[in-house]
């Protein structure tokens, strides 16, 4: 199916198969499709609503077109789709260091802030990490620090064809949700935070169509794209060859007290950097530390390091209290800067 045929189909509200969506994405990412065709397709797809098959087909092509990071061993990604408007501090980024301190190899894929003041790239840069590394630089971080960061614009050169169109049409499109599915290090383990419950289910099924080994897709209480402390969280457990399993998990189920969402608010880069350092150094106790423990625990489970979230919380606590989480941050800073 070519993109003109796909536009006609989607305008008529017909869902594309995974193979058809992949074929269209191939045209977009090879520069064959015109800007007008890309804009029409993205808008029509958004209005129809993307299916898990369409998302998976497009993600598979975007993965292939990425600049790959090669690492000999399993890696996990912790990220969110963003767009929740909650303005929390950088929870998943902090949790990534805690997960690395517990023994996982974390290949984090992210960008600068889109809907918040301070995105993962912004806070890492503020902490002293050199974020614009090439594939070999990231691989070195994975080998020597147990955690690396792939700055999305550097690793998706084929996005240059769709990027200007996305900016010009100014609406959220399927590309806003493809980023977390297209890790250049081919992470087959993942924690994916999603701000919408309906989209969380859709992305769980999309991941089950890809080569995922184990992932947790999480939707926080109140519409947040990470596990939170204010109430029950929706989790989809995705394992290779199985339909996603849905569950509700409240903080007290894993031994953590509830806290209002306002207790997790972040600020500008300097403010968030101070929070991350205070948590990783063990100085901070309270809701901000607790929410990091919760989200790091999800990584332990998705990475098959912990059998359940309660055990994961205990492992996360030890990662911080032993100094290993902070050590991972300091190692990442040094390795990324060539020191």
Swiss-Prot record:
One of its GO terms (biological process) is L-tryptophan biosynthetic process. Binds 2 magnesium ions per monomer. Its cofactor is Mg(2+). Pfam families: Glycos_trans_3N (PF02885), Glycos_transf_3 (PF00591). Pathway: Amino-acid biosynthesis; L-tryptophan biosynthesis; L-tryptophan from chorismate: step 2/5. Its EC number is 2.4.2.18. Anthranilate 1 binds at residues 80, 111. Mg(2+) 2 binds at residues 225-226. Gene3D superfamilies: Nucleoside phosphorylase/phosphoribosyltransferase catalytic domain (3.40.1030.10), Transferase, Pyrimidine Nucleoside Phosphorylase, Chain C (1.20.970.10). Transmembrane segments: none annotated. The keyword Glycosyltransferase applies. InterPro entries: Anthranilate_Pribosyl_Tfrase, Glycosyl_Trfase_fam3, Glycosyl_Trfase_fam3_N_dom, Glycosyl_Trfase_fam3_N_dom_sf, Nuc_phospho_transferase. 5-phospho-alpha-D-ribose 1-diphosphate binds at residues 80, 83-84, 88, 90-93, 108-116, 120. It catalyses: N-(5-phospho-beta-D-ribosyl)anthranilate + diphosphate = 5-phospho-alpha-D-ribose 1-diphosphate + anthranilate. GO terms for cellular component: cytosol. Keywords: Amino-acid biosynthesis, Aromatic amino acid biosynthesis, Glycosyltransferase, Magnesium, Metal-binding, Transferase, Tryptophan biosynthesis. One of its GO terms (molecular function) is anthranilate phosphoribosyltransferase activity. It is an enzyme of class 2 (transferase). Anthranilate 2 binds at residue 166. Mg(2+) 1 binds at residues 92, 226. NCBIfam families: trpD. Homodimer. Belongs to the anthranilate phosphoribosyltransferase family. HAMAP family: TrpD (MF_00211). This is Anthranilate phosphoribosyltransferase. It comes from Chloroflexus aurantiacus (strain ATCC 29366 / DSM 635 / J-10-fl). The lineage of its organism: Bacteria, Bacillati, Chloroflexota, Chloroflexia, Chloroflexales.
